């Protein structure tokens, strides 16, 4: 098993190559050179793929947990700018929607003509041989700036490491975060979780020892 983390930049290569655009929905994933989607059944595991519009700046709308005056730690925002579509293997089936599910809400993710996107992918290859894969973006969009610009946030429910996630060898356990506070009025269009902090052991096929992976 081999894991790899890499960063990439996409200057005006999504929907804004001909001018500004509005994205209604999107999904990100990885494929092989023949176009077949790479997933655990083919030996490729996505720990996460994060994307950020590095040019776009938004005022935070959600607080950090346990502190109503401090903005939430924006994980994708670590790339700079505003969070865009992302995925983890436990949340890869459905993408992100920037309007209502039926598409009637007049809103979307606004992208300027000069906006540049940055991506951060962490992948694991369970195959014995190296594999060449490609990151893909499947977007539903319309030309121009249309409707309300949605706001996004990618944050940690453990407030950046405190409280620690509770673990148990005897059965289920719960970890409760501090309270999050909304910093402005609005409507939530969607949300999904992504598990972090899981540590497991496996038998190394080359060194006959137990190895930890996070």
Task: Give the location of each predicted region.
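Beta-strand-centric surfaces of beta-sandwich/beta-rich domains
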Residues: 1-214
């Amino acid at each position: 098993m081999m894991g790899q983390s890499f960063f990439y930049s996409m200057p005006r290569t999504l929907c804004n190559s001909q001018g500004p655009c509005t994205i209604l929905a999107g999904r990100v994933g990885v494929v092989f050179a023949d176009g077949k989607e790479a997933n655990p059944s083919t030996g490729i595991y996505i720990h996460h793929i994060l994307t950020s519009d590095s040019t776009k700046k938004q005022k935070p709308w959600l607080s950090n947990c346990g502190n109503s005056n401090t903005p939430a730690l924006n994980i994708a925002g670590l790339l700079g700018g505003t969070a865009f579509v992302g995925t983890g293997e436990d949340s890869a089936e459905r993408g992100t929607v920037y309007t209502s599910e039926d598409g009637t809400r007049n809103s979307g993710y606004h992208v300027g003509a000069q906006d540049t996107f940055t991506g951060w992918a962490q992948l694991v290859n369970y195959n014995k041989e190296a594999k060449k894969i490609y990151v893909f973006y499947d977007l539903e969009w319309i030309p121009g700036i249309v409707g309300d610009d949605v706001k996004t946030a990618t944050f940690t429910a453990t407030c950046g490491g405190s409280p620690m996630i509770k673990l148990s060898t005897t059965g289920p356990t719960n970890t409760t975060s501090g309270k999050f506070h909304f910093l402005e009025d609005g409507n939530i269009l969607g949300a999904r979780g992504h598990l972090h902090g899981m540590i497991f052991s496996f038998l190394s096929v080359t060194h006959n020892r137990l190895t930890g992976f996070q």
